[in-house]
């Protein structure tokens, strides 16, 4: 199936969030599906989801649990380009970091669905030699990968469930800074990225996912389904090249 052509013309129907104030700069028009999205760097944030050793490094939780992360290196490079462009444009960069306390109290016990469905917890129960290794705060698995170290001005928001908005400071952090638009990257497309993006939609944020700056757990069909969900029901879908050309054309 061919990819629909991107329309880059800003019209009265282009979602643009809050009305433009007198004297405010014109928004950047990000080519996207199903229609272009008008964004200001000043009221937008780049959300980098769970770029941790657990999800993107060999020997981390996801690799140890049997998921294919061979495509993660390409995703890492694309996210790094996106972060550089966002910083050039003066856009807020927010890193989400998934995990629990070393005693796993935050993970929930048998009374929590998370205890039963988390593949990290299930893998550790099945392989006792791995107990305490996965997603424990302070451990290597929990750390952000070397290519994604936050810089001054970036924000790191810890989270304990798939959605970055659940029981976290993410919503208040964004609203305090007047953020209305969110640009999503990270791992895994169909789990924490999509969960957080769906909650963003419910909280009245305009959300766009850069499809080539995300990586799924489960195969190409899963990625395709998640992209379909986002562009059809919850937000917009664009690419790293289009984002960089829109916000940091000198580096494109």
From Swiss-Prot:
Record field: compositional bias (Polar residues): 1-14
Claim: Kinase is one of the keywords in the record: no
The encoding gene: rutB
Classification via NCBIfam families: RutB (TIGR03614)
Gene Ontology molecular function, alphabetical: hydrolase activity, acting on carbon-nitrogen (but not peptide) bonds, in linear amides
Function (record text): Hydrolyzes ureidoacrylate to form aminoacrylate and carbamate. The carbamate hydrolyzes spontaneously, thereby releasing one of the nitrogen atoms of the pyrimidine ring as ammonia and one of its carbon atoms as CO2.
Lineage: Bacteria, Pseudomonadati, Pseudomonadota, Betaproteobacteria, Burkholderiales
Reactions that this protein is recorded to catalyse: (Z)-3-ureidoacrylate + H2O + H(+) = (Z)-3-aminoacrylate + NH4(+) + CO2; (Z)-3-ureidoacrylate + H2O = (Z)-3-aminoacrylate + carbamate + H(+); (Z)-2-methylureidoacrylate + H2O + H(+) = (Z)-2-methylaminoacrylate + NH4(+) + CO2
Active site (UniProt): 50 (proton acceptor), 159, 192 (nucleophile)
Protein name: Ureidoacrylate amidohydrolase RutB
Xref: InterPro entries: Isochorismatase-like_dom, Isochorismatase-like_hydrls, Isochorismatase-like_sf, RutB
Pfam family, one: Isochorismatase
Species this chain originates from: Variovorax paradoxus (strain S110)
Record EC number: 3.5.1.110
Keyword Hydrolase belongs to the record: yes
């Amino acid at each position: 199936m061919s990819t629909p052509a991107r329309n880059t013309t800003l019209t009265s129907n282009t979602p643009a969030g809050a009305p433009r104030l007198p004297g405010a700069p014109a928004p950047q028009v990000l080519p996207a599906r199903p229609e272009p999205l008008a964004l200001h760097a000043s009221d937008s944030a780049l959300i980098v989801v769970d770029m941790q050793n657990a999800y993107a490094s060999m020997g981390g939780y996801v690799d140890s649990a049997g998921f294919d992360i061979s495509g993660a290196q390409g995703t890492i490079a694309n996210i790094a380009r996106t972060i550089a462009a966002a910083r050039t444009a003066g856009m807020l960069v927010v890193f989400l970091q998934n995990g629990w306390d070393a005693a796993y109290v935050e993970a929930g016990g048998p009374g929590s669905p998370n205890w039963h469905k988390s593949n990290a917890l299930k893998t550790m129960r099945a392989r006792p030699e791995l107990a305490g290794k996965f997603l424990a705060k302070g451990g290597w698995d929990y750390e952000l990968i070397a290519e994604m170290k936050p810089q001054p001005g970036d924000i790191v928001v810890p989270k304990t469930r798939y959605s970055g908005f659940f029981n976290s400071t993410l919503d208040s952090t964004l609203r305090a800074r007047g953020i209305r638009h969110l640009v999503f990257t990270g791992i895994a497309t169909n789990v924490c990225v999509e969960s957080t993006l769906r909650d963003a939609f419910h909280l009245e944020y305009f959300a766009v996912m850069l499809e080539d700056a995300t990586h799924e757990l489960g195969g190409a069909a899963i990625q395709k389904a998640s992209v379909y969900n986002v562009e059809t029901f919850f937000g917009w879908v664009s690419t790293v090249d289009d984002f960089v050309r829109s916000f940091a054309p000198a580096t494109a």
